[in-house]
Curated annotation (Swiss-Prot):
This is Serine/threonine-protein kinase 3/4. It catalyses: L-seryl-[protein] + ATP = O-phospho-L-seryl-[protein] + ADP + H(+); L-threonyl-[protein] + ATP = O-phospho-L-threonyl-[protein] + ADP + H(+). Residues 32-283 form the Protein kinase domain. It comes from Squalus acanthias. Proteolytically cleaved by caspase-3 during apoptosis at Asp-328 resulting in a 37 kDa form. Proteolytic cleavage results in kinase activation and nuclear translocation of the truncated form (MST1/N). Homodimer; mediated via the coiled-coil region.
Amino acid sequence: MEEVQRRQHPHPRRSLKKLSEDSLTKQPEEVFDVLEKLGEGSYGSVFKAIHKESGQVVAIKQVPVESDLQEIIKEISIMQQCDSPHVVKYYGSYFKNTDLWIVMEYCGAGSVSDLIRIRNKTLTEDEIATILQSTLKGLEYLHFMRKIHRDIKAGNILLNNEGHAKLADFGVAGQLTDTMAKRNTVIGTPFWMAPEVIQEIGYNCVADIWSLGISAIEMAEGKPPYADIHPMRAIFMIPTNPPPTFRKPELWTDEFTDFVKQCLVKNPEQRAAATQLLQHPFIKNAKPVSILRDLITDMMEIKLKRQEEQQRDLDQDDEENSEEDDMDSGTMVRASAEDTGTMRAASTLSDGARTMIEHDSSTLDSQMGTMVINSGEDEEDGTMKRKEETIQQSKPSFLEYFEQKEKENQANSHSNRNAQALQNSSDNWKVPQDGDFESLKSWSVEELQRRLASLDPTMEQEIEEIRQRYQAKRQPILDAIDAKKRWQQNF
């Protein structure tokens, strides 16, 4: 395995600190060899590449310029200002056709989320403590620089081949200034969002600490709290419910449980800061990053095995196709005496005599399938895959749901009218509060089903109100940005 890693990542001739002015004036293909697509990040696709001059492996995010350029520039600006071993480094950027190429540090082991998913195993307390220690150091640095990440989760904590964790994906990160000390916009990933972020009451750096606590549970259990329910429902539950904890608390030590508890304090003023949490016994006693190397090696071996299996399947398919080509030499088909047609049904021909074939509907799917599109579940196994190229916009990921539901509402106005009727019929009943469900016992099954059906229209109405409130706050900012751009052009 070490030999494979050396072969895939030869030692660079010199360490790349920053791209030279000369390099930045060239076309990116002259400076880098792009090797393969790694996946999707905020606003664009991420590729693995080699810097030709130094031989160093880098990551390149390619972002279509029709994406929210303001957010992209913000991400670059934040990365440019950061110089920490616990934050992904930024080397430079290019414009190429309609894309912006952002050149960043390559983390060969991928994200902590990848580590869990590919191995199909959650992490131990020791492994979690080691990862969280590096993550907290990254957060301490960011918060000292008066920056909020705003999207901390296992998928945005990257690991290099040595096991060092680094914060990445600053697509929604924000700068704190003296004149704007608090944010009041809902940005981030719903399951990891702090209550004060959802409630739009203003927040600061400790919003990242709540997300870190949720990420700790994610590493331990494989998914964050509320992951099994709809994100929209989670948004309403997070601010009102008690802080989440482990599904099976008895599996975890008191130190780990207390660490998570200190992260998940609902009142942000009472929540611990990164510097304080670095002194927590769970973090202070963390083991060195060397304990993560076996996990990383295990993951890479699994990926390599999948690639080899896939290559064998491809080779086997090529051999079968080659044999069929050798056998398929018939161009003239002898018809039976009663058959005078020139176009024949596929079922009447032998395998080796297909010149002009009329397929019926039953044979079309089975005999004419040439390009197979893998399902999204087989991410690691396909060589030719259809990848969704949708770009994440500069809004909370869950707000895409609002837009989708709005389209569905327009297309299904009739069903909406029925839903409204249900909503009207339910106006005279009260939702049980604080777990008091005694009143439900007196209702009939039909009544319970009717009232359950009325909940969704109510939720959609509340969601629409949130969307409109968000848009009302967002539009003046966009107008101000446009005004500043026009002013700069005039001067």
